[in-house]
Amino acid sequence: MGWFDRERMDSPLRAMIERKASIAVASVAGCLLAPALLAAIWMAVKPVLQSSPWADLWQDPRTFDALTATLWTSIAASLLAWCSAAYLLRQAFIGGQSGRWLNRLPPLLATPHAAMAIAVTLWIAPTGWLFRLSSPWLTGFDSPPPWATTQDTWGLGLILVLWLKELPFLCWVAATQLHRDDVRRRWHAEYAVALTMGRSPQSAFAEVVWPQLARLMRWPLVAVLAYNMTVVDVALIIGPTAPPTLAVLAWEWLRDADLALNHQGVAAAWLLAALLIAISAVLWVTVTRVVTSFTNRQAIGLGWVTLFLVYALAWLALLVGSVSGLWPFPDVWPDHWQANDWLRVTDNLDSVWTTVGLGTLSATLTLLWLVAWLECAPQNWQAVMRPILLAPMVLPPLLWVFGLYQVALWGHWEGAWPGMVVAHAVMAMPYALLALESVYKASDRRLQSVALSLGRHPMTYLLVVKWPLLKRALWSAWAIAFAVSVAQFLPTLYIGAGRFVTVTTEAVAQSAAGQRGLMSAYALLQTVLPLLVFAIAVMMGRPRHFTKDQTWT
């Protein structure tokens, strides 16, 4: 009897074996990841079970001011991104151009936060382009003004960077929902009914489409708020310094040789987590109503063009900054151009290869694990595991990094490639899951029934039918995981134990040193590497074209 014989395929024994094999694969996948994540959480909990870290935290004179700066910058940036996303999505939906704009988001997503922070610094610094373009004819300045336009006390520069970076992310999450056939048809039908009842396009979107879309985007909003409250590298580049944000303060305490200060830093991270839960609970209930009112207003239709123009200007600033030589104020362009900083980068190519290696390995590990889990795990297992998988996205990275560092010490993976790859994969997992999960689960199960009825083995169906049809989503998830890996700062510092240098750690270090050319070059590399990977993903994810004579086997 042949391997693909239909009677054998339909036998209860074979079905039972295949079901048990799938559960075994899911069990292995779950057992590989869940203990590591839970152990990391436990390692981060242990230091704060005593009262002394909390007492030290509240007695520190910088805590309250740092907490105030954190709440102001994070909430302001999150609400700005949320309202802007609502406006842009309304504009794209009403104009029938959602696919046109949303498909162009990958270059914006590929720009790391640190690179955007450096680009904004090059624009708004006292010696930046903004003052050069307006001096002296408008401002009257013949020399840079003595103003703290970056790292200002109010954190306005930090708010601007976080707003610009989180806006494309929220739009991309919405795109994953708008591109689902079932949702798109239903929402367009309901929108058309609202129009026939005399509603304006703005009112129809605000009252019919947006409330449903917003409910699906509340977890991504929590992720945005969590990142904004706990970001370290961006705050080091452009955030306030007197006081710094609480995340930066906690990072400084965790780096100290004093164990008591380490525990104080962990307590600060848990304080951020508690505040995140409280603020998220309020936003969960109120933000949809607030923005529904906002989306019901008339507005100028230049939002998407403005967003892409801002990113183009950011990339231009990085490019010019990386090749600029002597540049006296208020000249708009440098006196001469040079490539010395790029030559110094080429002398340190190890940082580039380390970044590429970590990104490739961690993205591949992430994708393999997710596919195995989504394909083999029962639905009730996935429902239980999903909050754990999304936890790295919504909990402070400082907690994860501290916990993973303790796990790495226990497993002797500190400063080693396996520990680095696993740490980067853990941080990339939730973003890749968001990109892949809905599309993977929405695949047409009738195709599997047809394949099995033709006597094909389930693995043949996966290799020849399902995965090729999903290759765009699979490559996109892999590219997103790669981009997340490139942007990692804290895991590289802690798990790498200072032995791994990436373009991100170099960009942050050079920005602290005030090296305009070097920080621009590394920030540009931060952007170019994910862009190249997204381009590869687009090319590899193109649909196949068959001729009449081609068949699948």
Residue ranges of model-derived segments:
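Short, Lys/Arg-rich, polar N-terminal cytosolic tail immediately upstream
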Residues: 1-19
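Membrane-interfacial, low-structure loops and terminal tails that flank and connect transmembrane helices
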Residues: 8-9, 13-14, 194-199, 291-297
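Short cytosolic juxtamembrane segments of multi-pass membrane proteins
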Residues: 3, 288-297, 498, 541-553
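Juxtamembrane helix-boundary/capping and inter-helix hinge elements in multi-pass membrane proteins
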Residues: 95-98, 179-188, 199-202, 241-243, ...
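Short helix-to-coil transition segments within interhelical loops
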Residues: 182-213, 449-470
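Short, membrane-interfacial amphipathic segments enriched in basic
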Residues: 50-57, 329-339
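Glycine-rich helix-loop "coupling/hinge" segments at transmembrane-helix boundaries
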Residues: 232-260, 330-332, 489-516, 550
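Membrane-water interface segments at the C-terminal ends of transmembrane alpha-helices
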Residues: 17-49, 59-178, 212, 216-233, ...
